Structure formats: structure tokens, C-alpha cells
């Protein structure tokens, strides 16, 4: 009789432990899914912004004219 009571307590302990692990795993899975969706949303938004705000390329760097070369000492 004592053994059956101990077994039921042990089963309750393990089922509680399994429930805790299951809920923890489910919570982590949901958090991961939310973060992944936010990541995709931000990536698409930045891609959209880069297309709409397409800036012209910067001007080429200025070159030194040949007249200034006389000031250089060889």
C-alpha cells in the first residue's frame, strides 16, 4: 500500500516536472518565433526604405590640378 502511494507521488512529481519543462520549452519557442518575425519585419522594412530612399552616388573625389605640383619637393 505504501509503495502504491509512493508511486503515485512520484508520478505526480514527474508529471509536474514534465509540465514545467513543456511550458518552458513552449515559452522559449514562442519567444524565438516572435523574435524571428520581428527580424524579418525589420529586414523587409529596411529593404523597402533602401529602395524608396535611393540616394545618388557621391561625387568623385577632387583631384589635385597640375599647377599645384610645383609646390611639391622631389
Swiss-Prot record:
Q: What is this protein called?
A: Uncharacterized membrane protein KP93L
Q: Where are the transmembrane segments?
A: 20-40
Q: What other comment is given for this protein? A: Encoded wby inverted terminal repeats (ITR).
Give the UniProt keywords, A-Z. Host membrane, Membrane, Transmembrane, Transmembrane helix
A GO CC term assigned to this protein in UniProt: membrane
Which species does the entry assign this protein to? African swine fever virus (isolate Tick/South Africa/Pretoriuskop Pr4/1996)
Q: Which family does it belong to?
A: Belongs to the asfivirus KP93L family.
Location of this chain's protein in the cell: Host membrane
UniProt membrane topology term: Single-pass membrane protein
User: According to the lineage, what is the superkingdom?
Assistant: Viruses
